[in-house]
Amino acid sequence: MLGLIGKKVGMTQVFQGNGVVVPVTVIEFEPNYVIGKKTVERDGYDALIMGSVDLRSSKISKPIRGQYKNLENVEPKRYVIEFKGLKGYDAGDEIGLDAFREIKYVDITGTTKGKGFQGAMKRHNFSGGPSSHGSKFHRHLGGTGQATTPARTFKGTKMAGRMGGEQQTIQNLEVVFIDEEKRAILVKGAVPGVKGSFVIVKKAKKVGV
C-alpha cells in the first residue's frame, strides 16, 4: 500500500471556494528513499522498506552503515518503515508527492500526545461519584474487585494510569491540497501527535466506509 513518512507541522484553516472554513493539518515530507525490497519469491510477500530523515553521524554504527553500502547517495535514515504490497521501485529510488496526485483520502498513523498519569475519569471517561455535598468519592474509580468468587480484580480492568503516548491511526482524512514544491500536503481534520512528530501517511484503506 502506497505510503510516505512525513512530519506534522501543525494546524491551520483554509477557505473553500464557497466560503466554508475547513480546519486542516499541515504535513511536511523530507525525501523518502527506498532502502530495501521484499519479494514474494524470497520473503513471501511484496514490500518496500522506506527511509526518511538523515541519521546523525554520531548515531551511525558500522552495522547500520553496512546496510546502506550498496545505495549510492543515500545516507542512513532515522525513520525506517515497511510498506507492504508495494513494488515497481528499486533500492535507492526517491518517492515524492507526485505519488499522491490522484489520492483523495489517506490514513495517517502517529503517536498521540503523552498526558502522564491520569485518573479514571479523564483516562476512560468514567462519570465518577455524586458531585453534591455529602459524597466522599467525587472523582473516584469505584469498585474494581468481585465478590467471594473470584475474589480478585481481573487483569485489564480500567483504572488510573499513564495516558497517551500510544500509536493511533485516523482513517479517511480528506486531502485538501498538495504542494509539491514545498513538499507538503493539507489534510482535513486533526492528526495524532505533537507538532514536529513524525507520521505515516498511507492511501486510505476503506474509502467511503
From Swiss-Prot:
Residues 127-151 are annotated as: Disordered. Keywords: Ribonucleoprotein, Ribosomal protein, RNA-binding, rRNA-binding. GO terms for biological process: translation. GO terms for molecular function: rRNA binding; structural constituent of ribosome. The keyword Nucleotide-binding does not apply. Belongs to the universal ribosomal protein uL3 family. Gene3D superfamilies: 3.30.160.810, Translation factors (2.40.30.10). This is Large ribosomal subunit protein uL3. One of the primary rRNA binding proteins, it binds directly near the 3'-end of the 23S rRNA, where it nucleates assembly of the 50S subunit. InterPro entries: Ribosomal_uL3, Ribosomal_uL3_bac/org-type, Ribosomal_uL3_CS, Transl_B-barrel_sf. Part of the 50S ribosomal subunit. Forms a cluster with proteins L14 and L19. It comes from the Bacteria. One of its GO terms (cellular component) is cytosolic large ribosomal subunit. The keyword RNA-binding applies. It holds the Pfam family Ribosomal_L3.
